[in-house]
Amino acid sequence: MFTLFISLIAGAVAGWFFTQDLNSTGWGVFCGVATLFITQMLIALFIRFKSGKIQKEIESVMQDAQAKANRLMVQFERRPPGSIKVAQQQLEKVQNDAVRKTLELCDKYTPYYKWNLMLPRQINAMKVQLYFQLREFGKVDELLKKSLLLDVRTKLIKLVRLYKKDDPSLDKFYKSKLTRLKGEDGAFAACVYAWMKVRQEKYDAAVAALVQAKKLSDNTVLLENYDRLANQKYKHFSNAGFGDLWYSLYLEEPQIKAQRQQQRMF
């Protein structure tokens, strides 16, 4: 909002000045419009520079946390902990501490919200993923209403929340936001949705989702799940082959807890 306001003022002042100085309305209008766009560009570059500095701070926190987790893993290999659960709790604490630090850093974007109307929705989308990792689903639901859903992860989180709340818009959201994905993203999204439909005993919808995804992906898990459904082996449907990508959605817990020690940090 401020960007447009300041640009309009700068353009108007420049237009008036050059109209008077050059005694030409045409040149005055041209210079005014040029000043407007140049002002917008300079403000955008300034915001990008400031945002870049914050992003580097966030990346530093993530890298430090990953390094600490790696050191713990090496330590566990040398001196195994008393139980896998204890090791998992230590790793999750490292992850959660990093997530909370990242959320604090996200607040540094706030002063620039008034300069870029899309920035709040972009940062909210980032916070959605962070709060989801912390399993603070109430905050996730609140932020999803004010987020820009551009990346696959955020869209899948919304799909999960719609499923968990038995929201009737689940099918519409999947068809409008996730059916056009290709490759691994498309395969994973289709298998997540199909898993939900199997749980709801809507097998035809599950098969239809996988058939559509097969046109854009030859992912092994996708093909295996399609064969299971085609042969009516509904209880054998499994997304375990996607590993942590699947378990990080919290729809299922891994059968072997140790698998999650390698969970992706963010």
Where are these regions (language model features)?
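Short coil/turn linking the two alpha-helices of tandem helical-hairpin repeats
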Residues: 65-69, 135, 164-169, 201, ...
